[in-house]
Amino acid sequence: MSKRKFKEELLEALVPEIYGPAADVKPDIKPRVLKRVKKREKKEEKEEAGLLDDGVEFVRSFAPRRRVQWRGRKVQRVLRPGTTVVFTPGERSVTRALKRDYDEVYADEDILEQAAQQVGEFAYGKRGRYGELGLLLDQSNPTPSLKPATAQQILPVTEIKRGVKRENKDELQPTMQLMVPKRQKLEEVLENMKVDPSVEPEVKVRPIKEIGPGLGVQTVDIQIPVRASSSTVSTAVEAMETQPELPEAVARAVAATREMGLQTDPWYEFVAPTSRPRSRKYTTANSILPEYALHPSITPTPGYRGTTFKPSRTRSTRRRRSVRRRSRRTAPISVRRVTRRGRTLTLPNARYHPSILV
């Protein structure tokens, strides 16, 4: 026996409560419960059992239940503002079975104002930051020949506005103002002019003008081409008569038989702006290459950029004795000049391995 076995036997004899053999612990296993399956009764036995019931027939043992028993949501009842609460001991103050009184059904007179201001019973939910905006406007007129016909108004932006988490100070607020010529009356311009959709408007973007600390205004002039309406053209055509005045009787007879032909739309001679196609000039690929240095083992090809790298002597302050090594003289590279498309190219002659048969 080993020393370990001796020690185990001695410890079991001296301290049996610690080193003694473990007590037999029965495993906690639940006994398996077997459900006995009731055998199906035969049809004859069922008929005999039905005769013993003294002819009593049970249609249903209980009423059919609904498939879904939905009791509704549990809502926390909150008193509407303005409702008077009366407490009477021993009496229920809430009658849930009855409907609300008509005094409670009718709302306040300023219910719409409360909804707009989100106060009273409408004081819930997130509030959007859509208050009155204060904008710094530029009153200067970069086009002196035009006068403002309308005030500066904020353009409605069609973007989907989501919840504003932080105040966006860099947000643009575009404004619009209609300008008309100074020499024409405002009524004539608005009534007698029509927009010509065939002609594209001329857009001129002006530089940003600083109107405050860290705030600027950029003016964009959009010149919309207009055309005169039919009424103004008809008056102009009627006034152009070069015939001499006729007697009154002859003029009536001529007016009865003559048909008036009026020009409704003026004739515009529209010439499309002809722009020359830009001819892009690309330089040769050799001019794009930078000045580069080749490895000393590479012999530079004549006609191309690149020089052999030579280390400068200023790098080492200590003078070294250089032992000249005799290097084999390399044969000069043979070059041929080829003219293609009027350009002379300097190409090196290819040298092949002796194993390659040309």
Swiss-Prot record:
Domain of life of the source: Viruses
Subcellular location: Virion; Host nucleus, Host nucleolus
Protein's recorded name: Core-capsid bridging protein
Induction / repression: Expressed in the late phase of the viral replicative cycle.
Further details from the record: All late proteins expressed from the major late promoter are produced by alternative splicing and alternative polyadenylation of the same gene giving rise to non-overlapping ORFs. A leader sequence is present in the N-terminus of all these mRNAs and is recognized by the viral shutoff protein to provide expression although conventional translation via ribosome scanning from the cap has been shut off in the host cell.
One term under GO cellular component: host cell nucleolus
Cysteine disulfide links: none
Entry-linked Pfam families: Adeno_PV
Keywords, in A-Z order: DNA-binding, Host nucleus, Late protein, Viral capsid assembly, Viral release from host cell, Virion
GO BP annotation list: viral release from host cell
InterPro entries for this protein: Adeno_V (IPR005608)
Subunit structure, as described in the record: Monomer. Homodimer. Exists in equilibrium between monomers and dimers in solution. Interacts with the histone-like nucleoprotein; this interactions bridge the virus core to the capsid. Interacts with core protein X; this interactions bridge the virus core to the capsid. Interacts with the endosome lysis protein VI; this interactions bridge the virus core to the capsid. Interacts with the peripentonal hexons. Interacts with host NPM1; this interaction might play a role in virus assembly.
The keyword DNA-binding belongs to this UniProt entry's keyword annotation: yes
Annotated gene: L2
Protein family according to the UniProt entry: Belongs to the adenoviridae core-capsid bridging protein family.
Organismal lineage: Viruses, Varidnaviria, Bamfordvirae, Preplasmiviricota, Tectiliviricetes
Predominant subcellular localization, coarse grouping: virion
